[in-house]
Structure formats: C-alpha cells, structure tokens
Amino acid sequence: MDSISFSFLLYEAYCVALYLVLPTVPSPASTRPCLKPLHRDVVVRTSWSVFLPAAFLFAFIDMVIDPVALRGDRWFLGKIYYYPDPGIHSGVPFANYVGWAVVGLISLAIYFPLERRLPALTPPQSVTPRLLPGVGLYYGVLVFDLGVTFWIDESFMGMSGLLMHLSVIVLLMVRLAGPHGLSPSG
C-alpha cells in the first residue's frame, strides 16, 4: 500500500476513535439534533483513550483489506504482491497487522504533541460534522472491501471480516444516534 493510503486510513481510524471517545455536548431536549453533538476537547483528542483505539482501528481495517488485496488477481486490482510465507489469517502473516499497528502508534505519537501545541481555535460547539467524513470514509473502505470479498466468492472471509467489525459498528451507531441520556419519566 502506498504512503498516501496509510495516511488516509490512519486519519479515518482517528476520526472513528474520536467519535467513540469525545464527550457529548449537552443540549436541551427540545433542540436535540438527530446526531449527538461531540465537544472538541484537545485533552481527550490526544489522550490514551484515543491513541490506542485509533491505532487498533488502523490495523483492524487492514484485517479486511489485505486478505482481499492478496487475491487481487481474482478481481480488477491484479496480483500486486504476495507473501513468501503466507500467514494463517487468509494468507496474511500476523506480523503484517503488528506492523500496521506500530506504524499507527508511531504516527500518532508524532501527531499528538503537535496537536497539543496548535493555537486554540474557536470551532463550533460540536465537532460532529467535522468527524463524519472520516467515519464515512472508514466504513466506505470497509464496505467496498467486504463487497469485493463476497463478489469473488470468499464468503467465509467476508463473514469473518463483517463479524470482526460488527461490535465496533454497533458501538458507533449507538454513539452516533443512540439515546441522548435517560430522562426521568414522571
């Protein structure tokens, strides 16, 4: 994979991690938007609670991308690479995923101190609209790769990729549009 793709996938994974972790902005019951407004908090944005999930999500999406890319000769990608010692995960060695996680951790370790030093902006109260494109791209890549996986008749590989990501998808959906908090009924 080229270095630009790494950057985009890391940005997308970072957006998903932020969406899962950033605090919500309280809003009156009468003006609640359909998507939860998230507060831009530089301390949270550059904390371990974002750092580790972002690196994990970066390597996690590769667990769907690489097995189908390895079979590029069966679809329009073509045979672009191979592993001399195929791994147990659909032919991809585990070291590949460790490498992705390490690249993600190093990249974020460089970015986070820079983010903390940037001058404070006066962004809108909610950063939800700014995160949605990254979240959408992450899941767009996932849907594309799963679609190709099923299209080339790799049903087991496709189902395992779907099931691996299902828990994160459910958490994200609850976070995106789930209950805005319990209100006392009375």
Enumerate the language-model features and the residues they cover.
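Aromatic-rich, lipid-facing transmembrane alpha helices and their immediate juxtamembrane interface loops
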Residues: 1-186
